[in-house]
Curated annotation (Swiss-Prot):
Protein name (database record): ATP synthase epsilon chain
Key word Cell membrane present: yes
Amino acid composition bias (Basic and acidic residues), ranges on this chain: 97-112
GO cellular component, one term: proton-transporting ATP synthase complex
Superkingdom of the source species: Bacteria
Residue ranges of the region described as Disordered: 97-122
Encoding gene per record: atpC
Species: Corynebacterium aurimucosum (strain ATCC 700975 / DSM 44827 / CIP 107346 / CN-1) (Corynebacterium nigricans)
Main location: membrane
Annotated SUPFAM superfamilies: Epsilon subunit of F1F0-ATP synthase N-terminal domain (SSF51344)
Localization terms from the record: Cell membrane
Keywords on record: ATP synthesis, Cell membrane, CF(1), Hydrogen ion transport, Ion transport, Membrane, Transport
Amino acid sequence: MADITAELVSVERLLWTGKATMVTAETTEGEIGVLPGHEPMVGQLIDNGVVTIHPVDGERLVAAVQGGFLSVSENKITVLADWSIWASEVDEAQAQEDLKSERELTRSRGDAALRATRRLNS
């Protein structure tokens, strides 16, 4: 099976690097899926998006992201997010509280976290 090298990096940490069969991300142009052999491109992530990685040897990984970019080159995709959290790390009660925050950034991150959790559980 063909694979692509994938990296998910936030400003704070490297979340994942490895071989994947597909990566999907929500960009300002819509949701895209990147498979091995994809044409080179650069995209801007939406402010409260979800990235899904389908590793070659494991279950799919879902992360909430806050802004950033993705870059696709020959057989490699790099997702660089301003902020990111794995759906499996989300405290759903806290994310629900974040939706009530007066700070727009906090509300957006809460929304992204809950969307990632729903995607993981679907």
